[in-house]
Amino acid sequence: MKLSKKGEYALRSLINLGIAAEMKRKLVQVSELAESEQLPVKFLEQILQALKEAGIVESQRGKFGGYRLGRPANTIFIGEVVRLIDGPLAPIGCVSQTAYEPCTCPDEAHCGLRMLMVDVRNAIAGILDRYTLADVVEITLRKMRRDSISLPFSAQVAGARPRARVPARLAREQLALRVRSTRKGRTSPTEGVLHHILGEYSI
């Protein structure tokens, strides 16, 4: 499985909408979402429309309109979003649980390749179907706070000057430098970065 650009942008936008909700922002404009992650606006609008049709986000029109999550973040599973945008998680059709397609193998039940790909599918699904958007938002905010990164999408008080935000790319570079400077060891591939968000590890 390879996440497409469309799938990547969908997840990044949802994470930002989740962060905005935690920051008590009611709505986020498409242009703001695009700017925060340096994404093309027109392409992002198409992705948000697909998410809206699935009920994952909702929008409000008007001068002060924008997007917000259509469901609680703890009910939006990452695997659901990936399947919606990119299709089945399975690397080959004959092991898919949601879009099965017979393969050309004459003996599917005893096909070694299929057995291997079942394990691959289960490993991918086991991670993407375990975590919700709320989980990813939580660890993102925890790590940003730990590394003193300016939090995006803070609710603005009327009349107050908006706080300057660090551009997404620069923030990621600063974060990488902090992590490398304090790293003591690497996370085991079987443990997962999400479980070690407060530890010292390399992303």
Residue ranges and their predicted role:
Residues 55-70:
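Beta-hairpin "wing" of winged helix-turn-helix
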Residues 10-24:
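Short amphipathic alpha-helical interface segments
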Residues 35, 52-53:
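Alpha-helical residues within the helix-turn-helix
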Residues 72-158, 162-203:
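Non-DNA-binding regulatory cores of transcription-related proteins
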Residues 48-49:
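Short, hydrophobic-biased segments on the C-terminal half of alpha helices
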Residues 27-38:
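A short alpha-helical element within helix-turn-helix/winged-helix DNA-binding domains
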